[in-house]
Amino acid sequence: MSPSMPVATTVAADPIAVGAVAVKRPALVIGSLSTAEDGTYQALISDLQSSRQVDRQLLDRLVDNATTLEPSSYDSVHITLAPSDYQGLTQKLPQLLSQLLTGLTPLGTLHLINLTSAVRTLPSELTLAGFNVLSALPDEGTIIAQKPQHVASTSVPLKSRQPGALLNRKKTDPAKKQALWALSSPSTPKIDPEALLTAEDKTRLTPACEPVRSSAPRRKKACKSCSCGLAELEEEERKLGKVVLLDGSQDGTAKEVSQDEKERLIIAAKAAPKATSSCGSCFLGDAFRCAGCPYLGLPAFKPGEKVEIDFGMDDF
């Protein structure tokens, strides 16, 4: 059997007092097939059995989840592997460290033995897993880490509302709640809306045109080759219709004439020799005169009547 590897002595983290004797919790030794063949695994177990109970596990069973560790069941965990085992454990190292952190008691220690320079990132991996690195001895190939002492978390139950608490609540009067949002109080005097109306407001307006009767039949218009007499009826109505002539002067008035009178005035204006203009309707008043008409501003005159423009009428 090969000589035993140096093992760091540990102090029991959580001794259980049985009378006056302090009993240590078991230790866990983790090895591999390589360390079992060269005797390192067995030598480590023999050294630890002199002071406490020792449990044994192989690395592949923990990595493959073939077995799990009971929470807070070991005071210390000792790992002895070959350099090739440490190199092949790089991808599954966080998973293994998480299991070991669960299996250790608070302030329990983790001992990594027979390390090489190929695992220089192991201290940082231990810190990320939740361990406190106590000592790192690269020359001796040993790292000791400790599980921190966490304060046990306690759950605080939330108080549920008692059934009687709803009955003790003060009930709100619906009338008071409605009065809070009312725009006026009951003591406010009311205003008669009819008193706000004047006599003019109450006067019924006279419609400017006849009301439209949707049920009344629509009147047809005469066609071009009318032979039913509708064209003659429309022509008679046109002649009997009235036309309003507006005087565009400042004091001008409106005069209502018939269609025949309008046609007579137009014919007379065309026949008048002195009433010369481009439109031929200057005698009708400013409403029928263009912007450059010389008679603009003068009252209407009869066709053929001589109109004299006094220059004294202009304001110089």
From Swiss-Prot:
Residues 279-293 are annotated as: Fe-S binding site B. Residues 209-228 are annotated as: Fe-S binding site A. Its cofactor is [2Fe-2S] cluster; [4Fe-4S] cluster. A motif (Cx2C motif 1) lies at residues 279-282. [2Fe-2S] cluster binds at C209, C223, C226, C228. GO terms for cellular component: mitochondrial intermembrane space. A motif (Cx2C motif 2) lies at residues 290-293. It is found in: Cytoplasm; Mitochondrion intermembrane space. Signal peptide: none annotated. InterPro entries: Anamorsin, CIAPIN1, Dre2_N. Residues 4-156 are annotated as: N-terminal SAM-like domain. One of its GO terms (molecular function) is metal ion binding. [4Fe-4S] cluster binds at C279, C282, C290, C293. It comes from the Eukaryota. Keywords: 2Fe-2S, 4Fe-4S, Cytoplasm, Iron, Iron-sulfur, Metal-binding, Mitochondrion. GO terms for biological process: iron-sulfur cluster assembly. Residues 157-202 are annotated as: Linker. It holds the Pfam family CIAPIN1. Monomer. Interacts with TAH18. Interacts with MIA40. Component of the cytosolic iron-sulfur (Fe-S) protein assembly (CIA) machinery required for the maturation of extramitochondrial Fe-S proteins. Part of an electron transfer chain functioning in an early step of cytosolic Fe-S biogenesis, facilitating the de novo assembly of a [4Fe-4S] cluster on the scaffold complex CFD1-NBP35. Electrons are transferred to DRE2 from NADPH via the FAD- and FMN-containing protein TAH18. Belongs to the anamorsin family. This is Fe-S cluster assembly protein DRE2. The gene is DRE2.
